[in-house]
């Protein structure tokens, strides 16, 4: 029997190890933390979502990234010190920009499939992880953000993911604790949440 090492005990590592065991491999899972799923899998808020499938390879991301380099609280930080690995990664990132639409559609299809696998595995193994199939609401404070989300929604729909535009009143009906002023939102009913631990 072949033995495979999987490095990282987040959702990707654990599900990869599970799939390999199902195929007859012996698997050893290595995790640097005391508990599994303490980094990215924990930070995503327990989302089992396909509605975040928009790829980052877009001109606007590059422009935002340049602005963010001047902020200490940026959502994405890139150390500007050049290295061969970093420069080649950036070149590949930029080269993928013309494929933004096709890649977003393909990523939506992949995300839907991954979500279905997770649901099936949890059911087959009897895993209770506080699954809530209540959808995920994305909110936008201005027309520009909402209009961009509408364009993304068309790509997600092409990938098989329905999501609908909602008004501020509809947003408050979906999420009664929502406060503040918003332009609108998009609600993906098929998205879910669960407890990664």
PLM feature spans:
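Hydrophobic/aromatic beta-strand patches that form the interior of the parallel beta-sheet core
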Residues: 28-30, 48, 137, 164
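Glycine-rich active-site loop/strand segments that organize a redox cofactor
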Residues: 43-109, 129
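Accessory recognition modules or surfaces
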Residues: 1-7, 11-12, 36-50
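N-terminal Rossmann-like FAD-binding beta1-loop-alpha1 element of flavoenzymes
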Residues: 2-29
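Rossmann-like flavin
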Residues: 86-197
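Glycine-rich FAD pyrophosphate-binding loop
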Residues: 22-42
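Short glycine-/acidic-enriched loop or helix-start segments at secondary-structure transitions
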Residues: 16, 39-40, 59-60
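A secondary-structure boundary/capping signal
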Residues: 7, 31-32, 44, 133, ...
């Amino acid at each position: 029997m072949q033995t495979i090492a999987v490095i990282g005990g987040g959702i990707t590592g654990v599900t990869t190890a599970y799939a390999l065991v199902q195929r007859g491999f012996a698997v050893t899972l290595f995790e640097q933390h005391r508990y599994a799923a303490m980094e990215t899998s924990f930070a995503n808020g327990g989302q089992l979502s396909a509605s975040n499938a928009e790829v980052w390879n877009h001109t606007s991301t590059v422009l935002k990234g340049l602005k963010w380099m001047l902020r200490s609280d940026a959502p994405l930080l890139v150390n500007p010190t050049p290295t061969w690995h970093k420069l080649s990664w950036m070149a590949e990132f930029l080269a993928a920009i013309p494929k933004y639409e096709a890649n977003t559609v393909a990523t939506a299809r992949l995300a839907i499939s991954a979500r279905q696998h997770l649901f099936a595995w949890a059911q087959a193994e009897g895993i209770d992880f506080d699954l809530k199939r209540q959808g995920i609401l994305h909110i936008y404070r201005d027309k520009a953000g909402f209009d961009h989300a509408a364009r993304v929604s068309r790509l997600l729909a092409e990938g098989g993911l329905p999501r609908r535009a909602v008004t501020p009143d509809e947003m408050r009906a979906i999420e009664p604790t929502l406060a503040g002023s918003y332009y609108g939102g998009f609600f993906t009913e098929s998205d879910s949440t669960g407890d990664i631990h």
